[in-house]
C-alpha cells in the first residue's frame, strides 16, 4: 500500500516538475525581448494583459510567462535584483494555489511579487499576508517600486489605521497586511450597519508568507471581538486562594493534554472547603447545576497555577497579563485567554481582575483563509505538515530547490544530565566560536531561559544581544546584525523570522551606509566565512520538528557556510513530558558514565518523540475544525443575512408576519383546539395591541391574519420617510444580539459536550444536533423580535429610534 502511495506521490511530483520546467523555460525565453522594452512600453504591458483577460478571454495561465518576465525586468530596473530561476518556479507554484517551500534566504519576498502581479490583473485585489506590522510595512516599501513601475497600486494595512484609510488600502491592486488585521477587519465588517461602512472587498486571492506559522501554529487560537459580561472577579480571587492551599495529591496535572482534574478525595476536600466558606450550601454536591461556575473557576485557577509559567507563557507588564506566542516568543498585546483562564492568571499574579468577556464575533484562521477564492503560501518548513495542509486547506506542498547548494553542517545533538551541565557546554562552545569571530545565534524556548542564559554569558564576560518578547521593538535590527564577526545573539524560538541574517551583518540596517561602510561589510563577511559562517545553537528541542528546522534554517542561507547543533538535558520539557521511559532510562545509564551523549541514535529517538507530539497536535486541530465548521456554517448564514439586509432596496415584513403568526398559532393549539387565553397573551406580547376579540370570532386564523397585516401597514405609513432604514436597523440589531447569545451558548455547549462521550454518545454528532436546534430557535426568535420591535418603534429625531 505504502509503495503505491509513494508511486502516486512520485508520479505527481514528476508531473509538477515537468510543468515547472516548461513554465520556467517559457519565462526565460522572453527575457531578451522584454529587456528591450522602454519603461513606458513595459508599463503599458499591464494594460495589454488586462485587455487580453477581459476582451479576448485569455486566462491568467496563458499570460503568466510574459507577465513573470515583465516582473523580473521591473525588479532588475528598480531594485537591481533579478529573479533567479528557482524564484520564478516558486512564483509559478504560488499562482497554482499551492505552498512553495523554499530555503531561508532564497528571497521569498521577491517571489511573492510574481504571483501578486499576475493575479492583480483580474482587478479583484490580492492580499499578501505577513506575521507582523513591521514586515508588512517593510515589504510594501521595498516591493512597491516593482508594482508601480508596472502601473499597479500597492498599499499596506497596519494596526494603527482608521476605517477610511483601511477601505482605501483594500481598494489597491495589491495589499500587504498581517493575518490578524485581515481577520479582524472581516469580523468588524460583519458588525457594521451599512455596506458603505465596510472596508474589505471580496476575498479573492491570498499569498501567505510564513504559511506554517499562520495556518498551523495559530490555527487553534481564534480571533475574537468581545464585550464585557457580568463581573465574577471575586470568584477568581477566592478560587485562586483555595487552589493555592490545595494539596497537590488531590488533583492530577496532565502536561501532555494541559488539563487538571480533581481526584475523588479532591472533590470531597473541595466540597468541605466551599461549604466552610459558604460558597455552597451544606449537603450540596459540587457538581449540582448551581455550583458549576464555581467548579469552572476552580479548575481554571488550578490550570493557571500548575500549567502556565510566568516569563514562558506570559509576562506581567504595566499591571497586565501579556500572552507570549509559544511559537515565535512574541508578545500578543490585546489577546486574552477565554473561558476565565485570563482572570485566573490575573488572580494568580495578584493583579486587578478584569471582567470576563462575552464573544460578539469570532473566527479561526482556518476558516477565515478557507474563504479566499484562491490561497497559496510560502515557508522554509512545510514538508513535515504536508498532510495537514492538504487535508484542512486543500494545499499541496511543492519543495523548490535552493539557488545554491546548502553548505550548513548539522551536528548531532548533545545531551546532558542537567540544565546546568548543558549551559556549561553551550558557554564553552560560545567562547570557542567568539574567539575565532564566528557569529552565534542561540535559540531558546522561553523568555525565562533566554534571560538565564544571558546571565551566564555576562558572568563569562561575553558581550551579546537578547531578543525576546521584551525587546520586540528592536527585533529586526538585532536579528539583522546577528551575522557580524563574533556576534552572540540569544533569541526566543523564531523571533525575527522574515529578516535575513547576512554574514558580516546586514548593510541595509546601517544608517551611514557608504563606500567605506560597504568595504567594512565585505571585510566582515570574509572574516565570518573563514570562521565557518553563522553557528546556530538550539538549547532545547521544540515539540515540533518544524520549529527546530526553522531555527537551523537561519544559518547556511543562499549557499553560505554555517553550522548547527542542539544541546539537550533530561530536564527539557520534550524528554520529561513526551519521551518514553525506555529512552529516559537508557539516557540516565549512559549519562552516569559519561559527561554527555552525542550520537545520531539520540537525534532519531527525539525525532520519534516529536512525531508523536506533532501527530497528537494535528489530531487536536483536526478535531477542533470539525466543531468549528459547524459554527462556521452558521456564521456564513448570519453574515449572509446581514449583507442581504444591507443591500436590500425594499424589505417586506409580511412573509415574516405570516411565519410568526403560524408559529404562534401552532404553539397555542392543543389537539384540534386553540387555547384562546394563551393565544391572546402571545399575540399581545408580540404586536402590542389588544387581541381580546379572539374570544368572539370563529375564524381565528383569518382574524389574526387581517389584524396583524393592518397593524404593520399602519406602522409603515407612520414611518414612511425612513421606513427602509428603520427596518434594516431593527433586523440587524436584533440579529447581532441573538447571534452574540448563540455564540455564548455554543461556547458553553462545546465545553460540556465531551461529557457525552461518557454516555457512549459521539460528541461531534451531539454538538451538531444541539447547535442546529439552537440555530432554529435563533431564527424563530429573530422573526418574532423583528415584528415586536417594529410595532413599538418611535422616531425621536432623524436617525434616532426608540423602542417603546
Curated annotation (Swiss-Prot):
Its localization reads: Cell inner membrane; Cytoplasm
Q: Name one GO molecular function term.
A: ATP binding
The EC number on file is 7.4.2.8
**Gene3D superfamilies recorded:** Helical scaffold and wing domains of SecA (1.10.3060.10), P-loop containing nucleotide triphosphate hydrolases (3.40.50.300), SecA, preprotein cross-linking domain (3.90.1440.10)
Give the keywords, sorted: ATP-binding, Cell inner membrane, Cell membrane, Cytoplasm, Membrane, Nucleotide-binding, Protein transport, Translocase, Translocation, Transport
Q: Which InterPro entries match?
A: Helicase_ATP-bd, Helicase_C-like, P-loop_NTPase, SecA, SecA_CS, SecA_DEAD, SecA_motor_DEAD, SecA_preprotein_X-link_dom
SUPFAM superfamilies per record: Helical scaffold and wing domains of SecA, P-loop containing nucleoside triphosphate hydrolases, Pre-protein crosslinking domain of SecA
Instruction: Write down the Pfam families for this protein, in alphabetical order.
Output: P-loop_SecA, SecA_DEAD, SecA_PP_bind, SecA_SW
Q: Which reaction does it catalyse?
A: ATP + H2O + cellular proteinSide 1 = ADP + phosphate + cellular proteinSide 2
What's one GO-annotated cellular component?
Answer: cell envelope Sec protein transport complex
* Topology within the bilayer: Peripheral membrane protein
Residues given in the record as ATP binding sites: 87, 105-109, 500
Q: Which domain of life is it from?
A: Bacteria
The protein's job, in short, is: Part of the Sec protein translocase complex. Interacts with the SecYEG preprotein conducting channel. Has a central role in coupling the hydrolysis of ATP to the transfer of proteins into and across the cell membrane, serving both as a receptor for the preprotein-SecB complex and as an ATP-driven molecular motor driving the stepwise translocation of polypeptide chains across the membrane.
The family classification in the record reads: Belongs to the SecA family.
**What is the name of the protein in this document?**
Protein translocase subunit SecA
